[in-house]
């Protein structure tokens, strides 16, 4: 199985399976001299970590990150500085229950990667889905924590804007609310609505999807390149690589198709500070594949979790019709924990393009 690496100069390889001994990542190309602490990485992992609320999977993983290489400890014993060599980060699995998956060892879960993995490789890891499990994304979040430090002053934030049919009101958007609720939403009035809905979904033995918005600020103008190295192309690619993601849009995205040309164009004037000023941001901070200096805005849609208690029709490995019920501990809405993963993917794309831009034009 190849294709476990992404990036050009800031290259990340993830490894490990949902029910293996551990998982982790190797970051190749991180510049020397980046100062960080494991606590900084841990903060993002804790945001993604399972078992933190009744609205996510009850699998209990501490997700404690371990640094194996690529940085030197400073005198205080907690601060590290990168050396420019490959950085290896490890996260141990401690709460696997592979016995929960015994029955589906010979069945294909509808909507999951079971069938396609089997068709392609002739073998699959049925224990929690192996590499197809959202557990793999913990390694991405760890890499994203360091990626944020590559681009000076970069701020990448995400929020859930919809769960199932329930959408936030953008007039009530408040970033300070995101860390104060289990749904990572910026609309405080939607917390109870989301809560009631997820409780019903879980009671019904099923799952639901979500839409997440990622905003990157302080992105310098000029990142990306025309045609085959567009910044939005790479952001979309990395967001699409996240488990269960089925759609991505940049800026107004599909809504732009309903606008007239004069409505969609981001007009410009010179600001009082002598710098170009955009009067809108329909493009989501990227024009012609190159960052404009405006905030980069991306959204992605996460489908309902495939592993549910509701019986579904499928087949087994011998070609017999079966009804599948998936036991185990699963997210009723995996989109909730996808917020820090989306942030990490955007941060990694920006770090990679920042280094490529610096290497090309200085």
UniProtKB/Swiss-Prot annotation:
Cofactor binding mode and count: Reduced FMN (FMNH(2)).
EC number, UniProt record: 4.2.3.5
Cofactor requirements of the protein: FMNH2
Pathway the protein takes part in: Metabolic intermediate biosynthesis; chorismate biosynthesis; chorismate from D-erythrose 4-phosphate and phosphoenolpyruvate: step 7/7
SUPFAM superfamilies: Chorismate synthase, AroC
Any Pfam family hit: Chorismate_synt
UniProt binding sites for FMN: 131-133, 243-244, 288, 303-307, 329
Reaction(s) catalysed by this chain's protein: 5-O-(1-carboxyvinyl)-3-phosphoshikimate = chorismate + phosphate
A cellular component annotation (GO) from this entry: cytosol
GO biological process entries: amino acid biosynthetic process; aromatic amino acid family biosynthetic process; chorismate biosynthetic process
Gene Ontology MF terms in the entry: chorismate synthase activity; FMN binding
Residues where NADP(+) binds: 48
InterPro entries noted in UniProt: Chorismate_synth, Chorismate_synth_AroC_sf, Chorismate_synthase_CS
Top-level taxon in the UniProt lineage: Bacteria
Functional note: This reaction introduces a second double bond into the aromatic ring system.
Protein family (similarity comment): Belongs to the chorismate synthase family.
The protein's assembly and partners: Homotetramer.
Protein name (database record): Chorismate synthase
Source organism of this protein record: Bartonella tribocorum (strain CIP 105476 / IBS 506)
